């Protein structure tokens, strides 16, 4: 690319409270030639609040693969473009992946501007472990597909983060209760940074019952933070994969060393694996 090639800016916008916009974002909006937005009417109101008037280009889930190349050509011709979503950080459960991929493949500079993200905002206030987490976005709309997805991640020991909508929250919690267990701890963060912001934690079963008590509690933008499945110290619950690994490694190394390696790989206590090996593997 030449020095005249434009820059694609990935710009985060507020998730509710308009005061959360960054100074750098406002300066970027002021200097770009075009703003690619998920919903041009919604974003028009947002930028109007800050006194910014710029041409818009509609880029959403239904047209991105078809239209991204148009923006790439504009960038090649020297236009600077800002990509925004309706709220929060673009590409996080929002359009933009295909555009960014095409820009990088074309050698166009992509500059991310950090800012609000509902998932991270909710996680940091949840009181659930935040050192390791797995963002899953929106679960499938149909119960069967939703349960299948939950079953695939039911054994995950990392914190799980989901987005959910008003009209599906109760059904989703019902399926979570069936697959993950009614006692799994969960935090619901609703309407983050807005007037009716609510952050509440309980077991999945109790949280669903709490929502049923007042229909207003099911309204708004929602983030679910689910505690990962705890590692068990019970020898009988050592996974088949861990047992197989222990068997294979113990053929080449002393059992104590094999137990230490498998413990590191699968998150079990070394002594639990060692005792299991003594009982089941040693001849």
UniProtKB/Swiss-Prot annotation:
The keyword Transferase applies. It is found in: Cytoplasm. Keywords: Cytoplasm, Methyltransferase, rRNA processing, S-adenosyl-L-methionine, Transferase. PANTHER family: RIBOSOMAL RNA SMALL SUBUNIT METHYLTRANSFERASE I. It comes from Haemophilus influenzae (strain ATCC 51907 / DSM 11121 / KW20 / Rd). It catalyses: cytidine(1402) in 16S rRNA + S-adenosyl-L-methionine = 2'-O-methylcytidine(1402) in 16S rRNA + S-adenosyl-L-homocysteine + H(+). Catalyzes the 2'-O-methylation of the ribose of cytidine 1402 (C1402) in 16S rRNA. It is an enzyme of class 2 (transferase). This is Ribosomal RNA small subunit methyltransferase I. Belongs to the methyltransferase superfamily. RsmI family. Pfam families: RsmI_C, TP_methylase. It comes from the Bacteria. NCBIfam families: 16S rRNA (cytidine(1402)-2'-O)-methyltransferase. One of its GO terms (cellular component) is cytoplasm. SUPFAM superfamilies: Tetrapyrrole methylase (SSF53790). GO terms for molecular function: rRNA (cytosine-2'-O-)-methyltransferase activity. Its EC number is 2.1.1.198.
């Amino acid at each position: 690319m030449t020095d005249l090639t434009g820059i694609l800016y990935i710009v985060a916008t507020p998730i509710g409270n308009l005061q959360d916009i960054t100074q750098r974002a406002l300066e970027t909006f002021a200097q770009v030639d075009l703003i690619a937005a998920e919903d041009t009417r919604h974003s028009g109101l947002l930028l109007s609040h800050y006194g910014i008037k710029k041409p818009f280009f509609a880029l959403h889930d239904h047209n991105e693969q078809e239209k991204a190349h148009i923006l790439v050509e504009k960038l090649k011709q020297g236009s600077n473009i800002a990509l925004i979503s309706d709220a929060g950080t673009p590409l996080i459960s929002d359009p933009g992946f295909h555009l960014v991929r095409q820009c990088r493949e074309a050698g166009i500079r992509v500059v991310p501007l950090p800012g609000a993200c509902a998932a991270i905002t909710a996680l940091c206030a949840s009181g659930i472990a935040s050192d390791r987490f797995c963002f899953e976005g929106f679960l499938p709309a149909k119960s069967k597909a939703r349960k299948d997805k939950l079953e695939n991640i039911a054994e995950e020991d990392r914190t799980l983060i989901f987005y959910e909508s008003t009209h599906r929250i109760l059904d989703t919690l019902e399926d979570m209760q069936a697959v993950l267990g009614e006692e799994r701890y969960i935090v619901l963060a609703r309407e983050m940074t807005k007037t009716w912001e609510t952050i509440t934690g309980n077991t999945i079963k109790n949280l669903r019952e709490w929502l049923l008590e007042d229909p207003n509690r099911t309204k708004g933008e929602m983030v679910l933070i689910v505690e990962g499945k705890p590692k068990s110290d019970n020898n009988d619950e050592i996974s088949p994969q861990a047992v197989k690994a222990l068997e294979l490694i113990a053929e080449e190394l002393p059992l104590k060393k094999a137990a230490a390696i498998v413990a590191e790989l699968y998150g079990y206590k070394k002594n639990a694996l060692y005792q299991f090996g003594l009982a089941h593997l040693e001849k």
